[in-house]
Amino acid sequence: MKQNIKKIYEIASVATICTALFKKGLKNQFIQGLSPLNKNISKMLGLAYTVRYIPAREDLNLIDVFKDPNHPQRVAVEECPRDYVLIFDSRKNPRAASAGSILITRLMVRGCAGVVTDGGFRDSHEIKNIN
């Protein structure tokens, strides 16, 4: 994101941005019902890098799939560009654990601007204390 654009978004309210998008014909460009784990962070800003989860088949989603370095979750964590926000679309299912403290810490170390999910996080008590 260009620095001049970023500065504009840093001072704009979410309502103002949503109204501007609405005027451009983009409706419902936000996820309802979200709340920050870390209440001390005032605003998160970055372009979106999105991962969409689909329901897992119990016969195919064995624990071994998570050892694969090409697993979509691992690839997303490693490919999410610096200063982007990683968005996990979990179909609003809180049982879909989008990530845990290890992957969130990895994203932070890699320079990710933040993480959003409409599902759940494992280790949320640890994630909220990551600085």
Task: Describe the role of every protein-language-model region.
Residues M1-N131:
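Feature captures the catalytic cores and cofactor-binding loops of soluble hydro-lyases/lyases
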